[in-house]
Amino acid sequence: MLFKSLSKLATAAAFFAGVATADDVPAIEVVGNKFFYSNNGSQFYIRGVAYQADTANETSGSTVNDPLANYESCSRDIPYLKKLNTNVIRVYAINTTLDHSECMKALNDADIYVIADLAAPATSINRDDPTWTVDLFNSYKTVVDTFANYTNVLGFFAGNEVTNNYTNTDASAFVKAAIRDVRQYISDKNYRKIPVGYSSNDDEDTRVKMTDYFACGDDDVKADFYGINMYEWCGKSDFKTSGYADRTAEFKNLSIPVFFSEYGCNEVTPRLFTEVEALYGSNMTDVWSGGIVYMYFEETNKYGLVSIDGNDVKTLDDFNNYSSEINKISPTSANTKSYSATTSDVACPATGKYWSAATELPPTPNGGLCSCMNAANSCVVSDDVDSDDYETLFNWICNEVDCSGISANGTAGKYGAYSFCTPKEQLSFVMNLYYEKSGGSKSDCSFSGSATLQTATTQASCSSALKEIGSMGTNSASGSVDLGSGTESSTASSNASGSSSKSNSGSSGSSSSSSSSSASSSSSSKKNAATNVKANLAQVVFTSIISLSIAAGVGFALV
């Protein structure tokens, strides 16, 4: 009886948490290449400030890099943000174990929206070994769940500067898959339609191709918006000399909103922010939707607008200069009633020297499918094997059997059906491949004591998917695979459908992601399977720690 009562209370609480009140700011929606207020259809320009310090708050001696979880600090800073005419803050990492309600309400009451990065330093797509895994997807979903019911959440970034030059463009396929899956998750959970986008660096070799890549394809795969961290205008420059004219011409045909996800070059100090007049002026507002100044807090990189000493705030010259510029803008405004959205589609970039990401995207991570596969194995890794030893085992086994079933290659657009599983599940899969290839005797499942035999089982809900995928894990499972028990229904596929730290003039060290190239041949996929495990291991450890901290009722520090 008590359980039923608690369940009803929990259901009611969840319902009311998702209901917007009269005091909530209107949600921001995307129409064509612009943002609009949902209540009256007037255009929304981002007047943003990056708002996250390396040591945003401290709890029990642990540094928690989450400014939205410290009401004392955010309530202190909101009046200063309002002096800067701020209507958006960007937050780079979220600690989902902490409470954000007080700060989010205070920001709402000040008419300030939030764009939150889904990644964090320990849970992001690694540009050197890109993967899109169950653990990473679960981490992103937790951030969505934490903030979805706040109407002043403008959107989410699924990555920040993951691809940062032409050598690691393949990583963008994994970020685009994250955008696709997070957006679908938002829909599946019946949350309001919250935009999901990407924040890029301004690399001359890749910027146009990368923008086209994230803007191309069907609505279910392309980004809802695109940010570029722009540091071209330094000191007393102008629209043409700075490069702004060229960038505006390059992005004029985008059918999604584009804005500066960071800006504010500090090669000349104090910063004058004369670019503000140009950004919100007639030369740029047809294409650009504003920008986010980097950054609020003064740190060693000297990008701060204010310095903080305890609870005292001191405004710097940059603060005064930016305030003077941002408070005199008056951009032209469109309205959804008269606005005609851009309908022209952007072509996905062809692969070549400066672009190597395939339009075929990684499959949607499905933990239930991984559980099905693991239960169907006869030979599995022993529980007492240290995860630090996995790489050695992968290297040896993948020289003996084809590990394509657990590999992911963003260049070739080839992804094993189990490429999103945990390293332990993947290791068991390839151990079982070796065991069966070698004859299936007990000695074939030894691996110097690292493996053990189990009774293989296949649940009825698993059999069809496992049969279609095949013993090597390289085929696709058609249709929706409902594997129940805490997993989402998704299409298990080895080829998912779809179209696809700066110096003084750069961005924050809290940038969320870094990643790399996978090879396409069978021999390369063996090597890739071994190297991809390193990124996955970090995610497994991080997720386990978070789970333990939640169970113990303690906060977890994102550092």
Curated annotation (Swiss-Prot):
A lipid is attached at N528 (GPI-anchor amidated asparagine). The active site is at E161 (proton donor), E262 (nucleophile). Residues 474-526 are annotated as: Disordered. Its main location: membrane. The keyword Cell membrane applies. One of its GO terms (biological process) is fungal-type cell wall organization. InterPro entries: Glucanosyltransferase, Glycoside_hydrolase_SF, X8. It comes from the Eukaryota. Disulfide bonds join C74-C103, C216-C348, C234-C265, C370-C421, C372-C462, C379-C445, C398-C403. It is a lipid-anchor; GPI-anchor. GO terms for molecular function: 1,3-beta-glucanosyltransferase activity. The keyword Glycoprotein applies. Keywords: Cell membrane, Cell wall, Cell wall biogenesis/degradation, Disulfide bond, Glycoprotein, GPI-anchor, Lipoprotein, Membrane, Secreted, Signal, Transferase. Extensively N- and O-glycosylated. The GPI-anchor is attached to the protein in the endoplasmic reticulum and serves to target the protein to the cell surface. There, the glucosamine-inositol phospholipid moiety is cleaved off and the GPI-modified mannoprotein is covalently attached via its lipidless GPI glycan remnant to the 1,6-beta-glucan of the outer cell wall layer. Residues 529-559 form a propeptide. Changing E161Q: Loss of function. Splits internally a 1,3-beta-glucan molecule and transfers the newly generated reducing end (the donor) to the non-reducing end of another 1,3-beta-glucan molecule (the acceptor) forming a 1,3-beta linkage, resulting in the elongation of 1,3-beta-glucan chains in the cell wall. Involved in cell wall biosynthesis and morphogenesis. This is 1,3-beta-glucanosyltransferase GAS1. It comes from Saccharomyces cerevisiae (strain ATCC 204508 / S288c) (Baker's yeast). The gene is GAS1.
